[in-house]
Each structure stands twice: as C-alpha cells, then as structure tokens.
C-alpha cells in the first residue's frame, strides 16, 4: 500500500502522491498527485482536477497542470491542483485497497473489478466533488474546474452529460481532444447534416459508450430521457478544446472502431462534428446551448504541448486573478 504523507507543508512544490479518503457511506481510498497536503485545512479558493489519458500517467498530467496554472498566474496557495490516477492491477502503484480497472474501462465509467471492487469512475468523480465541497477541508473554496484530455476527456464528456446534479460549488468541465463522444440519439454527422447509420453498415454503433442504447446503471438509475439529458448538459459550463493538428487518422491511441469512425475521421473533425450536433439538437428539441469550443493553434494531441499554450490558460481561466 502507498502510504499517505502526513508531515508535509500546507502547499507542496512538486508532485506528491497522496491517498484521498473518498466515498460515503462506503469509504475507499484513491491515489492522486497534488500540490497541497490534504491532511490539513487548505486556503485554496479554486480547485483544478486534471484527468490523464490512456497511459494512466497522472504524474505527467500533474506537471502539465502545474504549467497551466503558472501560465494563468495561479499559485498553490490560491489553487489546489489534483491529478487523480485511475489504475489497473498491473500498474506499479496498484494495491488491494485501491479501486483497479481492467485496462481502459475506467474511461467508460465502468466499475473497478480488482482491488476495491465495484467503484465506477463516475462515482469517483462524484466523490471527488463531495470531497472538495467539504468546508472542513476547504473552507474558502469557490469553484472547481474538471479537465480531461484524450481518454480522460472521454470520461469527462460522458460525466458532463450523465453526472448527477451538484449544487455545492460551481463546476466547469473542460473536454480536450477525446477520441469519441456520447451521442444522444441515433443520428451521426453526414456531409449534409445528421442521419441514422444503417445497422448493416455499423452494428451496435448507438450502444453506450457512443450512444444511449444499453446505458450503464449509473445513468439508467436516473431515469432521464434524451431530451432531459441534453437540457441538463446544455445548462452546464462546458468548454471543448482540440489541437488544430490533431488530425492523424492513423493515430495508434485513437479509437478506430466503426462506432467511433461514424463520428468523424480524426479528433479535430469529431469535435467539430459534435459541436454541430449540439446545435442540431438545440434546434430540434428547443433547448438553448452555449458551450464554448476552441481549436488551439499549432497543437497536436500531446497534452503537455496543448495545455502549455497561453491561449488555453486564457480560455480556461478567463477571470484569473
């Protein structure tokens, strides 16, 4: 087991793995890298949570988050940085008391299947928000930014759609360069608009995680139809990012399934297509939506490069101190 670090200064200069005690009434521990000693009450007014990609390299994403905060003029004293680590049983940090997922299933919201079993990655995000809203720990916290990139953005986009209502703190969602998105009906982008795909061309393309057929229990238990889901999603503060050079259709870490290819040939086109889809649903269902979208100049898929762009700091923190 990885031991929590108990004798640290209130703010920490470098990435430090700590165990967060999450979940009520069934507690569990979760590994995260952070710039603060979470065993003390914190002075932070803002929290930034950044979710890693498919390689589960949370420490690298912590460093990416540090650069982002530096570019935005934010310091460890006023801004808590957290980089949670969704682990598998083969990762060196794994232990039996941590939730562990089979390979990339965490990005879909699935339950942990080893270590501490039965924890969905959506529940982890719910529990992280509840943890941050605890005034005993964070008496001055004003808002939370949830950032996901690549595989982390696949989780984040689905959580932004399906996550339960949270009213304790304002939450902003940043969805950066995922391979696919959750569509809310059977239509997909075409050259002239949106239309269903014939079943014989792509069987199962509308099943979860690409559509709402056969949804996970986390969503099914909420008993919301597609219009209700979209209305809630449209009301949330969502920002989309993608690099202008994230156009490699043969990328080894991009989803090449038929269901993903139905959303576009590359990450740039898939994101722009989804923004058009939001506009289509807005007109069709009479739901106003104003999510922001930014193509980052000269950036490809690399998280360190994309989030180092001064433009990204301006976009994510428009009201920085």
Predicted regions and their residues:
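Cap/lid segment of the alpha/beta-hydrolase catalytic domain
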Residues: 86-119
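The feature captures the conserved acid-bearing segment of alpha/beta-hydrolase catalytic domains
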Residues: 170-280
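Active-site glycine-rich loops that stabilize anionic/oxyanionic intermediates
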Residues: 53-56, 179
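Bacterial N-terminal signal peptides
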Residues: 1-9
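C-terminal catalytic histidine-bearing segment of alpha/beta-hydrolase fold enzymes
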Residues: 33-35, 241, 275-321
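A domain-start/cap signature at the N-terminus of enzymes
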Residues: 11-47, 55, 59-80, 106-123, ...
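Structural cue for short, hydrophobic secondary-structure segments
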Residues: 50-53, 83, 240
């Amino acid at each position: 087991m990885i031991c929590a670090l108990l004798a640290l200064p209130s703010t920490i200069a470098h990435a430090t793995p700590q165990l967060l005690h999450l979940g009520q009434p069934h507690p569990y521990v979760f590994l995260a890298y952070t710039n603060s000693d979470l065993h003390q009450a914190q002075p932070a007014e803002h929290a930034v949570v950044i979710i890693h990609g498919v390689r589960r390299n949370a420490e690298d994403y912590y460093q990416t988050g540090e650069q982002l905060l530096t570019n935005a003029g934010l310091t460890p004293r006023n801004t808590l940085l957290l980089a949670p680590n969704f682990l598998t049983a083969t990762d060196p940090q794994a232990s039996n008391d941590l939730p562990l997922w089979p390979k990339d299933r965490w990005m879909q919201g699935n339950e942990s299947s080893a270590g501490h079993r039965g924890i969905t990655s959506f529940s982890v995000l719910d529990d992280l928000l509840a943890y941050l809203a605890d005034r005993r720990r964070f008496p001055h916290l004003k808002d939370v930014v949830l950032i996901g990139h690549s595989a982390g953005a696949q989780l984040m986009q689905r959580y932004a759609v399906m996550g339960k209502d949270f009213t304790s703190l304002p939450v902003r969602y940043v969805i950066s360069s995922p391979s696919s998105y959750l569509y809310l009906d059977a239509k997909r982008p075409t050259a002239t608009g949106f239309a269903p795909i014939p079943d014989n061309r792509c069987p199962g393309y509308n099943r979860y995680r690409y559509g709402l057929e056969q949804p996970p229990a986390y969503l099914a238990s909420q008993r919301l139809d597609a219009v209700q889901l979209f209305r809630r999603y449209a009301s949330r503060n969502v920002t989309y990012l993608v690099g202008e050079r994230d156009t490699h259709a043969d990328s080894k870490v991009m989803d090449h399934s038929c269901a993903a290819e139905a959303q576009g040939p590359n990450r740039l086109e898939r994101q722009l297509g989804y923004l058009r889809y939001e506009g289509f649903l807005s007109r069709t269902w009479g739901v106003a939506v104003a999510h922001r979208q930014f193509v980052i100049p000269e950036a490809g898929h690399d998280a360190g490069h994309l989030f180092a762009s001064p433009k990204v700091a301006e976009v994510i923190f428009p009201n920085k101190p």
